[in-house]
Amino acid sequence: MLKKQTAGLVLWGAIIFVGWNALLLLFFWTRPAPGRLPSDSALGDDPASLTREVIHLAEDAEAELERQRGLLQQIKEHYALWRQRWRVPTVAPPAWPRVPVTPSPVQIPILVIACDRSTVRRCLDKLLHYRPSAERFPIIVSQDCGHEETAQVIASYGTAVTHIRQPDLSNIAVQPDHRKFQGYYKIARHYRWALGQIFNKFKFPAAVVVEDDLEVAPDFFEYFQATYPLLRTDPSLWCVSAWNDNGKEQMVDSSKPELLYRTDFFPGLGWLLLADLWAELEPKWPKAFWDDWMRRPEQRKGRACIRPEISRTMTFGRKGVSHGQFFDQHLKFIKLNQQFVPFTQLDLSYLQQEAYDRDFLAQVYGAPQLQVEKVRTNDQKELGEVRVQYTSRDSFKAFAKALGVMDDLKSGVPRAGYRGIVTFQFRGRRVHLAPPQTWTGYDPSWN
């Protein structure tokens, strides 16, 4: 009898779904033809018209997918209600304790990666100016490239910093089509050697990695001192970063410098890691493009980083292997926090995975959904916090570009994203660019 009822319910669900799609197909066949798209020449004269058309098409696709999803969800809910009568009650697992974070006196070195920028002085001056303790935060400058002027600048700090030099300055044998990427190969070699010195030779339990073209915020050390215990105790975390990829002035809430997030995207640009992580990564360290390698699923393993609302580092180095394009287009606009936040006196337990997932997802999916064009034109300002939904790679990229956030993806993960959600400020209100609540994971083919 039970099998007959189950089969009947599934059959009726299938009939409803097929019938709905048949009606939908009939609707599309019989509705009046839409107006013609603008000609290529017209679009060329009016780029804004093309943007509106792309957004309109993406929103139409989103709306149709949402209707289909709603019908399937109704079928699932009715089936679940029926099955619930036959389900044996289960005991919920015990909740994790919410333990307030306390500051740790552990010694955390600042590893400065240097090469041929004599402007490393600007980086070191700020680090030394804001450093609360030379004993707790020793500064170790690892220099590659053999650039003598840079070496003299580092040496001028005497015992205030420790100067180590990467000994292998030879070119690296690469494939002919990768000769133009020689710089990226040398950077990966330098990182491997420098991190090996920190963890294998000096035996530090953790380190903050800083490039020589970064300027730090007044609470840079406070931030890492407070988040270190979280990183050490929460296995779902693998780094703490000082960087917000969408941290431009107009895209952050300047009134909340204390705000921190979890992110699935590895940000770099001033980041804390543990010795245990280096022991995991060192045997398979890549020959080049180490940061994108870190963002692959095989390395990330579902783990997250902590990142701030307002960046605690700012890059001033236009010169580099990327020839300045990314700096001119994006990096130079990132806001550096100037207000000291006493993070070690705050309860940061809300960043632990169980609490964060519960509260953050409730906040995002409790926010009213608004079409991207209405967000762009600042309609319904009274809503304050809103959600813009995407369901495909193309709709994410279209909506991200329309709202001014970074639209690139690494192994399916958006910059600053957590569970597919990118949170930012737009024209004074909080916006969450988010997938449906039924999101189950990243698609690595979204690149």
UniProtKB/Swiss-Prot annotation:
Pathway participation: Protein modification; protein glycosylation
GO molecular function annotation: acetylglucosaminyltransferase activity; alpha-1,3-mannosylglycoprotein 2-beta-N-acetylglucosaminyltransferase activity; manganese ion binding
Lumenal side, ranges: 30-447
The keyword Repeat appears for this protein: no
Reactions mediated catalytically: N(4)-(alpha-D-Man-(1->3)-[alpha-D-Man-(1->3)-[alpha-D-Man-(1->6)]-alpha-D-Man-(1->6)]-beta-D-Man-(1->4)-beta-D-GlcNAc-(1->4)-beta-D-GlcNAc)-L-asparaginyl-[protein] (N-glucan mannose isomer 5A1,2) + UDP-N-acetyl-alpha-D-glucosamine = N(4)-{beta-D-GlcNAc-(1->2)-alpha-D-Man-(1->3)-[alpha-D-Man-(1->3)-[alpha-D-Man-(1->6)]-alpha-D-Man-(1->6)]-beta-D-Man-(1->4)-beta-D-GlcNAc-(1->4)-beta-D-GlcNAc}-L-asparaginyl-[protein] + UDP + H(+)
Cystine crosslinks: 115-145, 239-305
Compartments, record wording: Golgi apparatus membrane; Cytoplasm, Perinuclear region
GO CC terms in record: Golgi membrane; perinuclear region of cytoplasm
Protein origin, superkingdom: Eukaryota
Tissues expressed in: Detected in kidney, liver and brain.
Residues on Cytoplasmic side: 1-6
EC number(s) given by UniProt: 2.4.1.101
Cofactor: binding details: The cofactor is mostly bound to the substrate.
Binding site for substrate: 117, 144, 190, 212, 322
InterPro entries with a match to the protein in the record: Glyco_trans_13, Glycosyltransferase_13, Nucleotide-diphossugar_trans
A Pfam family the protein falls into: GNT-I
Chain segments annotated as transmembrane: 7-29
Catalytic residue list: 291
GO biological process: in utero embryonic development; protein N-linked glycosylation via asparagine; UDP-N-acetylglucosamine catabolic process
Cofactor(s) needed for function: Mn(2+)
UniProt KW keywords: Cytoplasm, Disulfide bond, Glycosyltransferase, Golgi apparatus, Manganese, Membrane, Metal-binding, Signal-anchor, Transferase, Transmembrane, Transmembrane helix
Function noted in UniProt: Initiates complex N-linked carbohydrate formation. Essential for the conversion of high-mannose to hybrid and complex N-glycans.
Subunit structure: Interacts with MGAT4D. Interacts with BRI3.
Annotated family: Belongs to the glycosyltransferase 13 family.
Protein name: Alpha-1,3-mannosyl-glycoprotein 2-beta-N-acetylglucosaminyltransferase
Gene of this entry: Mgat1
